[in-house]
């Protein structure tokens, strides 16, 4: 690696952000399967796009079709999954985008790794907090049922740990609130932190 040099470009992150008229950042949704991460990230992206923001949504299921298609679900593979996504998110922030991510991302250390990759003030952790019982009841993909039947191993919340964020920038309780109300909470919190206008 000592022969590989990072090339600085004349058009930098600040130039790209000014061109887009926004502050680039990563909005990192974390929580159990079925907590509502993808739904909320998608709804927030729609609201941001409607207000003229330049966004991109990285979804946990989608990256497993390509970028992370070679990875399994043991702890080491989950860590590598988040590392790769963090590197992609960093590049997208450098491009001046508001990047939304929807990943279980069960381990604090990996979420911290991404926070440090992206940089100070450009990472917003959103804990979508839904009780396990609510997530199991929703079970949109039937995964909890399979995990309880022993058909899926290393399933977060069942036989693999989820380390809840200790100090997320935004903590959303999602046990039945309408999506629109939660998106309003998100937008308000982002505006209060002067991350969006």
Curated annotation (Swiss-Prot):
| Catalysed reactions listed for this entry | adenosine 5'-phosphosulfate + ATP = 3'-phosphoadenylyl sulfate + ADP + H(+)
The record's active-site residues are 105 (phosphoserine intermediate)
- Give the highest taxon in the source lineage: Bacteria
Q: Does the keyword Isomerase apply?
A: no
Query: What Gene3D superfamilies does the record tag this protein with?
Result: P-loop containing nucleotide triphosphate hydrolases (3.40.50.300)
Could you say which protein family the record assigns here? Belongs to the APS kinase family.
- By its UniProt entry, which PANTHER family does this protein fall under? ADENYLYL-SULFATE KINASE 1, CHLOROPLASTIC, BIFUNCTIONAL 3'-PHOSPHOADENOSINE 5'-PHOSPHOSULFATE SYNTHASE
This protein's name: Adenylyl-sulfate kinase
This chain's source organism reads Aeromonas hydrophila subsp. hydrophila (strain ATCC 7966 / DSM 30187 / BCRC 13018 / CCUG 14551 / JCM 1027 / KCTC 2358 / NCIMB 9240 / NCTC 8049)
């Amino acid at each position: 690696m000592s022969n590989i040099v990072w090339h600085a470009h004349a058009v930098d992150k600040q130039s790209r952000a000014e061109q887009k008229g926004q502050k680039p950042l990563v909005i990192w949704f974390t929580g159990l399967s079925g907590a509502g991460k993808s739904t909320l990230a998608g709804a927030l992206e729609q609201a941001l796009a409607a207000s003229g923001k330049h966004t991109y949504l990285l979804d946990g299921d989608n990256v497993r079709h390509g970028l992370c298609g070679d990875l399994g679900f043991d702890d080491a593979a989950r860590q590598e999954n988040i590392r790769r996504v963090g590197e992609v998110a960093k590049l997208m922030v450098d491009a001046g985008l508001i990047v939304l991510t929807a990943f279980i991302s069960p381990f604090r250390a990996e979420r911290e790794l991404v926070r440090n990759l992206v940089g100070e003030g450009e990472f917003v952790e959103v804990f979508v907090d839904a009780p396990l019982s609510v997530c199991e009841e929703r079970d949109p993909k039937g995964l909890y049922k399979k995990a309880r039947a022993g058909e899926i191993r290393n399933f977060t919340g069942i036989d693999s740990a989820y380390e809840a964020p200790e100090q997320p920038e935004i903590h959303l309780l999602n046990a039945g609130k309408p999506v629109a109300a939660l998106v309003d909470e998100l937008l308000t919190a982002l505006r209060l932190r002067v991350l969006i206008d």
